[in-house]
């Protein structure tokens, strides 16, 4: 009897290990959404070649897709009413700007004593390859605090609790790196529309998992 139980448990474990990579494979192969605000871009899904964006320039020189500007402004106004003062540190980036960020990160690791291969590998854990960065869509922003009025932690806490009400999601949550391909970034928020944002928030999932339903 004991032998039968052991064999049964072994078969269950084998099935779990078989299904896990299969599930990841499904998440990594996401069809291109017809909705501009639900396009999934990550290390496995590049920006569509026909993607175009009209930009609005913010007061600090950063730029975002003009279609998300009203929602971003509304979110920031709400935060300020609560005594929280966020600023957009990074908005839209061109292909060339994304390449420069990656190159600079690689150089920084080399200057710390990393080999070329290790520097490239480590840099790519933190910086997306050109063509796979949401910043190139214009609908993702890195948000920090106006340091004279708030702390980053205060801003991150407020955003985590409220951003979904304004159509934004925390794009790279903790514990989702295997699925998103990106480490936890409490500053990186992405516009997805209010319905998707609220569902993603309420279910505690990431954008890739949203498309698994």
Model-flagged regions — what are they?
Residues 1-9:
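N-terminal Sec-pathway targeting helices
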Residues 8-213:
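Extracytoplasmic cell-surface/polysaccharide-interacting catalytic and binding patches
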């Amino acid at each position: 009897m004991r032998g039968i139980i052991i064999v049964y448990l072994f078969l269950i474990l084998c099935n779990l290990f078989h299904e896990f990579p299969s599930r990841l494979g499904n998440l990594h192969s996401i069809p291109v959404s017809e909705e501009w605000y639900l396009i999934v871009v990550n290390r496995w899904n590049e920006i569509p070649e026909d993607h175009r964006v009209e930009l609005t320039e913010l007061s600090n020189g950063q730029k975002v897709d003009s279609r998300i500007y009203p929602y971003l402004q509304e979110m920031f106004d709400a935060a300020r009413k609560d005594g929280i003062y966020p600023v957009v540190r990074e908005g839209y980036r061109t292909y060339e700007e994304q390449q420069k960020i990656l190159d600079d990160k690689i150089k920084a690791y080399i200057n710390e004593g990393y080999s070329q291969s290790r520097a490239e590998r480590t840099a790519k854990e933190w910086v997306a390859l050109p063509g796979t960065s949401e910043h190139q869509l214009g609908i993702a922003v890195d948000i920090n605090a106006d340091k004279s009025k708030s702390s980053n932690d205060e801003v991150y806490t407020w955003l985590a609790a409220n951003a979904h009400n304004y159509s934004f999601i925390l794009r790279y949550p903790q514990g989702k790196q295997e699925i998103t391909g990106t480490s936890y970034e409490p500053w990186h928020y992405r516009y997805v529309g209010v319905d998707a944002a609220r569902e993603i928030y309420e279910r505690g999932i990431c954008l890739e998992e949203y498309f698994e339903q």
